């Protein structure tokens, strides 16, 4: 096994010296709308040295935070010229002479944010990467470091949940929402999802229930529902908000005494309004969560390793799938960016750049 890994590094290094790698990257030199500022640029990459790893990107999703970063609306401000994207799954091509934990052919994902993943090839440091089993699907691996981890941490870090407890969330069809449903199913937790009404509401409800949602209600239905008062489900002790405005207020209204509302997004761009009654008489707490901060503070922590291990085990077992998505060729990145900017792109479908097309 050791000899095979050693030969793999030697052969890969020889291949690297014989063939120059030209990366096609989506770069931008100023903030603005992605369709306007992103350019497909070719660059020759250097051979990996020391602790560096050369990878071929296989698939990279377009997340709301990626769009906001390009627009200049996100707290993370990359240096120009910058390559878009934070997530991906890649294949190791070759490694530097001091790399010990990686070899050619392995699948990896980025552990650090802001590396720039909308590119066909890249050179990263070995401590910026995590090996992923090839049993994990490309779409699952490519979308594993933002939405599943956000759902995991919010379910673990704010309220000590037990099987049979209930969680309620708006934006239940978002990528994080879909991840919440699946984790709740795996852990025996009831998951109540709230979505906007739409012509295809029956199909949407069925899709979310297949993922693990216990109940899916529209914003109008939740206002008159008796699922909690009747005792059908326990009152939620934990709520997730990615919409804001009236939707967040309605979600908080259903929390049990001492419940916690966690806000991780604001798609409506309306502020979270705290109702006085629940705040005083039910001692409701309002918290915020940002996965990027948690990852930086826990970069090498055992808890982070445990989280990825659990998520990937569920993926390998077929108990956790990628969000509803569409694979898009890199050449059509402008169409994908425009679609991702739409409300549907934020809540209905994930667009993933397919670097193999």
Curated annotation (Swiss-Prot):
- Pinpoint the Enoyl reductase (ER) domain residues: 36-352
Its localization reads: Mitochondrion
Q: What is its main location?
A: mitochondrion
The record's Gene Ontology biological-process terms are: ceramide biosynthetic process; fatty acid biosynthetic process; fatty acid metabolic process; intracellular iron ion homeostasis
Per its UniProt record, what Gene3D superfamilies does this chain match? Answer: Medium-chain alcohol dehydrogenases, catalytic domain (3.90.180.10), NAD(P)-binding Rossmann-like Domain (3.40.50.720)
Q: Which reaction does it catalyse?
A: a 2,3-saturated acyl-[ACP] + NADP(+) = a (2E)-enoyl-[ACP] + NADPH + H(+)
Q: Which InterPro entries match?
A: ADH-like_C, ADH-like_N, GroES-like_sf, Mito_Enoyl-ACP_Reductase, NAD(P)-bd_dom_sf, PKS_ER
Record note on disruption phenotype: Larval lethal. Larvae have increased iron levels, which accumulates in brain neuropils. Larvae show increased levels of ceramides and some phospholipids due to dysregulated iron homeostasis. Larval muscles have decreased mitochondrial membrane potential. RNAi-mediated knockdown in neurons produces age-related climbing defects indicative of neurodegeneration. Neurodegeneration phenotypes can be alleviated with drugs that reduce ceramide levels or by reducing dietary iron intake.
| One GO cellular component term noted in the UniProt record for this chain | membrane
The active site annotation covers 74 (proton donor)
Q: Does the keyword Cell cycle apply?
A: no
Q: What class of enzyme is it?
A: oxidoreductase
Q: Where is the transit peptide?
A: 1-19
Q: Name one Pfam family in it.
A: ADH_N
Write the Enzyme Commission number(s) for this entry: 1.3.1.104
Q: In which tissues is it expressed?
A: Expressed in the central nervous system.
- Subunit and interaction comment: Homodimer.
The molecule here is called Enoyl-[acyl-carrier-protein] reductase, mitochondrial
Originating species: Drosophila melanogaster (Fruit fly)
Organism lineage string? Eukaryota, Metazoa, Ecdysozoa, Arthropoda, Hexapoda
Q: Name the gene.
A: Mecr
